[in-house]
Amino acid sequence: MPELENKFQVIVSKRAAQQLVEHAVFMARLEERLARQLAADFRKAADSLQSFPYRNPILRSSVFVTEKYRKMVFGKWYLLIYQIKGERVFVEYVIDGRQDYQ
């Protein structure tokens, strides 16, 4: 009997897409391969949210005061910030974890 698995719809906000582009442009100045790898890592992370998006911890922060957001690390130090509403996962932010976003 095949295993039944919930599939969540993942929606990337314009803001998150723009933040990803900004990070990739910066990395491309250093080495184009790094920018391509960042984009691939983001796709893999976002795609993985289709299954088990609750596996990542709730984001506790003075900036994000409500506990509606979750965080997922991808690449070496980037954070994918998202929230779950019903069967949809909304990717809201892409943050460089080395920077103080607090």
Regions found by a protein language model. Name each.
Residues 24, 43-50:
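Structural signal for well-ordered, non-membrane alpha-helices
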